[in-house]
Amino acid sequence: METVGLNAWYGKKQALFDVSLPFAENRVTAIIGPSGCGKSTLIRCLNRMHELVPEAKVQGKVMLDGTDIYGSALDPADIRARVGMVFQKPNPFPNKSIRDNVVAGLRYAGVRDKRKLDEAAERSLMQVHLWDEVKEDLKHSGAGLSGGQQQRLCIARALAVQPEVILMDEPCSALDPTATAKIEQLVIDLKKDYTVIIVTHNLQQAARVADTTAFMYLGKLIELGDTIDIFEHPREGLTERYITGKFG
Amino acid sequence: MNFRRRLVDRALIGLSIATVITAIVPLLSIVYDVAAKGISAINVDFFTQATPLANTPGGGMGNAIQGTLILVALSALIGLPIGLLSGVYTSEYGSNWYGSTIRFLGDVLAGIPSIVTGILVYALIVIPLHGFSVIAGSIALGTMMIPIVSNTSSQALKAVPNSIREASTALGSRRWRTTLEVIVNAKGAIATACLLAIARITGETAPLILTSGISTNWFTGVNQPVGSLTYFIYYFAKSPFVNWQNLAWGAALILMVIVLGINVAVRIVTRGKRAYS
């Protein structure tokens, strides 16, 4: 996946300026930067969620497997099934059971076979290491789980539709350190099968989980490189000042 | 200083309690009066017999009860679907000028006096059909229900957190499917909105005087007039005949039980639940 000359606006205010950013397949890429740098806007352009905001505009290309996802022949809903998203605050469907939460995306796609759905639920819950914790309670509501469990449930839900890319918008910022550690380990496990793009304002987290890191500031991509390089010898002065905490 | 503040505190609490009592007393007094005067008219005949002639013993309000039930059912058939669809539109799809206009018109429609709706339906339906009818009454009451249901269901849907819409959309669901998800999450509040709208129109009188008319017979067809509890209360209560007045009190009691019953049921069912569940 990569963006080519991506620009985005909220009404008259431009939030992204000509961002061209490649995301390596089966790797974890972290997007870091201070508040307002455009990282959430960028990630929402990757699954066509940005355009749902009233008066939002997108210009430029986002390539997925060689095709621009903003091509006029494409259905945004199909794109969103191929590019999954996990949000900052865990948002399981409160009126659905755990199992129904996980298979919600499959139901939207028209899958009705109960056995297929149950198998998919088990597979996804095992992928996020939640299966053993909830296998007795699949019929219970998702709202009864802890924050960390709910977030893993949301990740399982995103995985069930078998996307190619997983977007994570600050997935751990609402969680305690133990839950955070579990999710970070999960992110590293997931890159075997998926391309993971994670937005985080926690620099240490980026250092822990990401192979590649992109630093953004005021809507522009400032620097992109291997995480080790970005943290140990950043090329740009601005990157160095952010990493060392001189602003942020 | 401290003493004065405590005094003011106590005085205001006392004033609040006094005003609450002042507000509740008329309600309790009405309930008591209607119950006391109406209970003597309630017996099996009240529900099974049709309205009697003046000063004639026996009879009941069976046809009026039947008429009210039929009118409310048909009105709900007209008003609930249109009101709900309108509420869904203004909440989920109406972020443009078109949606704002619909919302505004809905507010205006909600404020139209019921007798005006009655006159309108009289001119549009009763005159061409050459007479009062159940259809006319249902259209009038249904039209009154539309803005009530639309506004309250729209509020119920808006109260559903955006996180649910985002979660659904991010999984690749189509717009209508996401909307359905939101509706399901608000189903309690929407059901409440529908029930309260039904309770409201059950007690309407003015539009029925001009549309469904009154009849001493049981239901004979949707293009015929039909008796209703509210119209009969009006008609019997202002008559000089005692048997009719007693039946009117009984009808008032039944009507009150129905409306209070719906309101209480709604309260019990939604007690302790989150606003949007």
Q: Predicted segments — roles?
A:
Chain B
Residues 25-58, 213-223:
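Short membrane-interfacial helix/loop motifs at transmembrane-helix boundaries
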Residues 12, 82-121, 148-155, 276-277:
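Cytoplasmic-entry segments and transmembrane alpha-helices of multi-pass inner-membrane transporters
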Residues 153, 175-210:
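Transmembrane alpha-helices
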Residues 12-14, 154-158, 180, 192-195, ...:
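C-terminal transmembrane helix and the adjacent membrane-cytosol boundary/short C-terminal tail
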Residues 54-55, 208-256:
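Interhelical loop and adjacent transmembrane-helix boundary motif
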Residues 82, 86, 90, 95-98, ...:
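Amphipathic cytosolic juxtamembrane alpha-helices at the membrane-cytosol interface
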Residues 107-143:
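Generic hydrophobic transmembrane alpha-helix motif, especially the helices
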Residues 59-89:
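Transmembrane alpha-helix signature in integral membrane proteins
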